[in-house]
UniProtKB/Swiss-Prot annotation:
The gene is alg-8. It is a multi-pass membrane protein. Pathway: Protein modification; protein glycosylation. The chain crosses the membrane at residues 4-24, 102-122, 129-149, 153-169, 174-194, 225-245, 320-340, 360-380, 387-407, 410-430, 451-471, 481-501. GO terms for cellular component: endoplasmic reticulum membrane. Dolichyl pyrophosphate Glc1Man9GlcNAc2 alpha-1,3-glucosyltransferase that operates in the biosynthetic pathway of dolichol-linked oligosaccharides, the glycan precursors employed in protein asparagine (N)-glycosylation. The assembly of dolichol-linked oligosaccharides begins on the cytosolic side of the endoplasmic reticulum membrane and finishes in its lumen. The sequential addition of sugars to dolichol pyrophosphate produces dolichol-linked oligosaccharides containing fourteen sugars, including two GlcNAcs, nine mannoses and three glucoses. This is Dolichyl pyrophosphate Glc1Man9GlcNAc2 alpha-1,3-glucosyltransferase. It comes from Neurospora crassa (strain ATCC 24698 / 74-OR23-1A / CBS 708.71 / DSM 1257 / FGSC 987). GO terms for biological process: dolichol-linked oligosaccharide biosynthetic process; protein N-linked glycosylation. The lineage of its organism: Eukaryota, Fungi, Dikarya, Ascomycota, Pezizomycotina. The keyword Transmembrane applies.
Amino acid sequence: MAEIYPSLVQCAIVATAFKVLLFPAYKSTDFEVHRNWLAITHSLPLWEWYYEKTSEWTLDYPPFFAYFEWIMSQVARLADPAMIWVHNLEYDSWQTVYFQRWTVIVTELVLLYALQMFVDSTPGVSKRAAHAAAVSILLSPGLLIIDHIHFQYNGVMYGILIASLVLAKKKSSLLASGLVFAALLCMKHIYLYLAPAYFVYLLRVYCLPPKLSPRSIFRIQFFNCVKLGGGIAAIFAAAFGPFALKNQIPQIFSRLFPFSRGLCHAYWAPNVWALYSFMDRLLISLAPRIGLPIKADALNSVTRGLVGDTSFAVLPDITPRMCFVLTLLFQAIPLIKLFMRPTWEGFIGGVTLCGYASFLFGWHVHEKAILLVIIPFSLIALKDRRYLGAFRPLAVAGHVSLFPLIFTPAEFPIKTVYTIFWLVLFLMAFDRLAPAPTRQRLFLFDRFSTAYITVSIPLIFYCSLMHGIIFGKSYEFLPLMFTSSYSAIGVVGSWLGFMVVYFTE
């Protein structure tokens, strides 16, 4: 088969040139967060990393990410020694900005390598579709907005995730897949949401006999279990062991899992609770007319979604336990099928649906977590047109919901034009590359997908531009609420559509 043009490397070179131009762009408080972590890991002994609180941006990622920051800090001191002083808060010299921006680009090479692994592992007939999916991830507006403007290190971590998913394709590399994912968990604990799919797939394919029966279910492949369990234990020991020696595990867990936060973030992530919050807002206006009681204390919470604020004025309050039960329930449903039919595509679908469930029903979900769904789904979105039909509204809703992260006027045309161009280019390319399904497509869902994308155009125009012209500084929460709620409709609709596709495959 002829080489596909442009290659991933060529796309990465062009993308890097564009990202370098964004070095002076807006940066969020996450920039100071990571500068402070560089300072903590470089200036303080290991035992003090998870106790240091000079800055409000304390270290709250697992140890492997702290080690990652320590490695970068060894180079940071050469770029500008002042950036790694713990007490040098809010320090952002141009050397610091350029250094931290470059670290995001350089570490994103892990993503490039993983995507090339994905393309190379795909059979010839499907390689062009796999290449298109890989390029769409490499040039993702989500990664551009979150990593290269807002500032985070998602590229390297999603690269590790994709490498783990690709390694799961072959039985010979299943062990490596599980160990790579374990290492990822020790870098960022948000990937715990995907762990149930890994557990079920590795249990079924690696630890149990290939042909399952009531008798053979208890005949585990003992040596495989020992290798997998021992390898995972060794990785967690390498990450947490030094801190366990100082009895610091409770302190680390208190940083990793702060349960005092509210149900919704200050800007509602586009999930079920965004629709629930929106419904509560509507009922506040309707309650006096239809005789519903209103909780007066909840009305005092104007912004709704502040830390610790989970009250609703009309609807019942939601507790962390409810979120946990719902998340677990909607993760378990597709995992039953994965256990019974453990194919690689089914595994990627299971990972995607675990991401959906955690995003839609989780407690205090950030809008950035939508990448947990978009990126694994991208790997199978071109399997056929039924899959693509479920992916379309997710791609639109997920990326548009990230717009409020970047609220500065200078970056408005960048995020808007880039995202729209990406959506038009890749959704059109995907439509040409996705083969016809073997089963009948969902007519109503196709209509929903088309209607949803059509309505999103004027909504983006109003929320991004017209609201400010009409109302100025008034009703500032209104476009955020519209964006979140409408995006939530797209994500929920996409989830329902993909659930149908997954179970009828």
